């Protein structure tokens, strides 16, 4: 089992997050906290489409996991007053799977494809005419007698979500009219999300405690809500049910989440480079072997936050741990 599967601070959705995220999900752009640039642009595009009585242009949402791409896809459907059909790149294994989904759509519907970068190229080719001309080309028969039949589709909006925009093929990426990058959240935005989640949980939470959880949530709402859920457990068992600063600090220390939101895996990655490779540079595959995790997981899940806070650098020669990370661990950088 991947160590990411057990990770409290992973931005990836876990099984236990599904019901919680559904209950916490805002229904409108007005209720949605953060992502102001993307939100304001979507407000204009949605309003313009409604005024023209057209479907919204296809939308690509990209950025690190846990920032609200699925939530925004559902909000787009709500704001347009249409239904949303949800699937994912790995779930669409054959062109026929995609054809079945497309032909089931009603006029104006939103089709949300999560992890769209994982679509097979043969499936992408079926998607191109569907996105451009709202039609589906189906090949009937085999060999010399095979013929292509074109089926008309109702106008729809494709919303694609990806953590790896660079992995999308250029022809697919170019067919999206709206591209929105989701950024990490500020501490104040996350604190507001934690307090809103506390209201849904019907748990009293001190404003300082909400800020402390926000500071350690790695700029990610999914992580903030997950941390609050665990801190709430400590508040009920070790306290009087109120999430206080004291309970929060105790809980997060026991959960091995430090003051910058780094956990034992981040420590293992950074200290591994420091202690075994004198801070780098060291290649990604070597780091992968050192901590026992796949290289693409390190690149997509672990490294973005470490790069964001300036603890790690990617260079042509490999990964380098920065002076900031040495300072965080109370260590001196080796002299060259």
Curated annotation (Swiss-Prot):
Gene Ontology, cellular component aspect: cytoplasm; Holliday junction resolvase complex
Residues engaged in binding ATP: 24-25, 66, 69-71, 132-134, 175, 185, 222
Region (Small ATPAse domain (RuvB-S)), start-end ranges: 186-256
GO MF entries: ATP binding; ATP hydrolysis activity; four-way junction DNA binding; four-way junction helicase activity
EC class: hydrolase
Superkingdom per UniProt: Bacteria
Subcellular location field: Cytoplasm
Residues noted as binding Mg(2+) in the record, renumbered to the chain: 70
EC code: 3.6.4.-
Keywords recorded for this protein, A-Z: ATP-binding, Cytoplasm, DNA damage, DNA recombination, DNA repair, DNA-binding, Hydrolase, Nucleotide-binding
Pfam families, A to Z: AAA_lid_4, RuvB_C, RuvB_N
Region (Large ATPase domain (RuvB-L)): 4-185
Region (Head domain (RuvB-H)): 259-336
Binding site for DNA: 314, 319
InterPro entries per UniProt: AAA+_ATPase, AAA_lid_4, DNA_helicase_Holl-junc_RuvB, P-loop_NTPase, RuvB-like_N, RuvB_C, WH-like_DNA-bd_sf, WH_DNA-bd_sf
Reaction it catalyzes: ATP + H2O = ADP + phosphate + H(+)
Biological function: The RuvA-RuvB-RuvC complex processes Holliday junction (HJ) DNA during genetic recombination and DNA repair, while the RuvA-RuvB complex plays an important role in the rescue of blocked DNA replication forks via replication fork reversal (RFR). RuvA specifically binds to HJ cruciform DNA, conferring on it an open structure. The RuvB hexamer acts as an ATP-dependent pump, pulling dsDNA into and through the RuvAB complex. RuvB forms 2 homohexamers on either side of HJ DNA bound by 1 or 2 RuvA tetramers; 4 subunits per hexamer contact DNA at a time.
Domain notes: Has 3 domains, the large (RuvB-L) and small ATPase (RuvB-S) domains and the C-terminal head (RuvB-H) domain. The head domain binds DNA, while the ATPase domains jointly bind ATP, ADP or are empty depending on the state of the subunit in the translocation cycle. During a single DNA translocation step the structure of each domain remains the same, but their relative positions change.
Record-linked PANTHER family: HOLLIDAY JUNCTION BRANCH MIGRATION COMPLEX SUBUNIT RUVB (PTHR42848:SF1), PTHR42848
Complex and partners: Homohexamer. Forms an RuvA(8)-RuvB(12)-Holliday junction (HJ) complex. HJ DNA is sandwiched between 2 RuvA tetramers; dsDNA enters through RuvA and exits via RuvB. An RuvB hexamer assembles on each DNA strand where it exits the tetramer. Each RuvB hexamer is contacted by two RuvA subunits (via domain III) on 2 adjacent RuvB subunits; this complex drives branch migration. In the full resolvosome a probable DNA-RuvA(4)-RuvB(12)-RuvC(2) complex forms which resolves the HJ.
Family: Belongs to the RuvB family.
Protein name: Holliday junction branch migration complex subunit RuvB
UniProt lineage: Bacteria, Bacillati, Bacillota, Bacilli, Bacillales
Gene name linked to the record: ruvB
């Amino acid at each position: 089992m991947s160590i990411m599967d057990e990770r409290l601070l992973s931005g990836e959705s876990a099984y236990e997050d599904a019901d919680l995220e559904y209950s916490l999900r805002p229904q409108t752009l007005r209720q949605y906290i953060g992502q102001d640039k993307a939100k304001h642009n979507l407000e204009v595009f949605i309003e313009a489409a409604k005024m023209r009585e057209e479907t919204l242009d296809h939308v690509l949402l990209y950025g690190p996991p846990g920032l609200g791409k699925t939530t925004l896809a559902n909000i787009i459907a709500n704001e347009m007053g249409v239904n949303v059909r949800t699937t994912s790149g790995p779930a669409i294994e054959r062109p026929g799977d995609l054809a079945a989904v497309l032909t089931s759509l009603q006029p104006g519907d939103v089709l949300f494809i999560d992890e769209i970068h994982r679509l097979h190229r043969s499936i992408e080719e079926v998607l191109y005419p569907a996105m451009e001309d709202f039609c589906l080309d189906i090949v009937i028969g085999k060999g010399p007698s095979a013929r292509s039949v074109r089926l008309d589709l109702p106008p729809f909006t494709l919303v694609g979500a990806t953590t790896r925009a660079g992995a999308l093929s250029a022809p697919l990426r170019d067919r999206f009219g709206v591209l929105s990058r989701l950024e990490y959240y500020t501490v104040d935005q996350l604190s507001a999300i934690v307090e809103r989640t506390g209201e849904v949980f019907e748990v009293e939470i001190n404003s300082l405690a909400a800020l402390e959880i926000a500071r350690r949530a790695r700029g990610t709402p999914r992580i903030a809500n997950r941390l609050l859920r665990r801190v709430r457990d400590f508040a009920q068992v070790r306290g009087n049910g109120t999430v206080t600063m004291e309970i929060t600090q105790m809980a997060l220390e026991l959960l091995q989440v430090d003051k910058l939101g780094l956990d034992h895996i981040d420590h293992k990655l950074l200290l591994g480079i420091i202690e075994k490779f004198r801070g780098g540079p060291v290649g990604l595959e070597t780091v992968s072997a050192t901590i026992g995790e796949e290289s693409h997981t390190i690149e997509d899940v672990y490294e973005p936050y470490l790069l964001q806070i300036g603890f790690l650098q990617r260079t042509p020669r490999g990964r380098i741990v920065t002076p900031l990370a040495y300072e965080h661990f109370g260590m001196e950088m080796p002299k060259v």
